[in-house]
Amino acid sequence: MSSDPRDVLLAPVISEKSYGLLDQNKYTFLVPPESNKTQIKIAVEKVFNVRVLDVNTINRQGKRKRTRRGWGQRKNTKRAIVTVAPGDRIDIFGPPVS
């Protein structure tokens, strides 16, 4: 894996569940399948300048989908749910809209 911490965090996950976890200081990111919890923690701390308390990872199996030429498969993904210290925030979704 590359030494650049920005290569570990591919994208934030935008879903109903991830929005619900924001109240608990938990942020969800897509990460490469070969990354581990230590790499994810270091990357979040360096990129966003926050203190990480906990990292939970989820390996998601790609769905089997029907195509014109038979069956295909979506790619497998890995997600990381990162808990940051109270008082720290990551503005990945922008400020709240009034």
UniProtKB/Swiss-Prot annotation:
Spans traversing the lipid bilayer: none
Signal peptide: none
Single GO BP term: translation
GO terms under cellular component: ribonucleoprotein complex; ribosome
Keywords, sorted A to Z: Ribonucleoprotein, Ribosomal protein, RNA-binding, rRNA-binding
Pfam families: Ribosomal_L23
Superkingdom, taxonomy of origin: Bacteria
Record InterPro entries: Nucleotide-bd_a/b_plait_sf (IPR012677), Ribosomal_uL23-like (IPR013025), Ribosomal_uL23/eL15/eS24_sf (IPR012678)
Molecular function terms, GO-annotated: rRNA binding; structural constituent of ribosome
SUPFAM superfamilies cross-referenced by the UniProt entry: Ribosomal proteins S24e, L23 and L15e (SSF54189)
Similarity comment text for this entry: Belongs to the universal ribosomal protein uL23 family.
Xref: NCBIfam families: PRK05738.2-4, PRK05738.2-5
Biological function: One of the early assembly proteins it binds 23S rRNA. One of the proteins that surrounds the polypeptide exit tunnel on the outside of the ribosome. Forms the main docking site for trigger factor binding to the ribosome.
SUBUNIT field: Part of the 50S ribosomal subunit. Contacts protein L29, and trigger factor when it is bound to the ribosome.
Protein name: Large ribosomal subunit protein uL23
Gene that encodes the chain: rplW
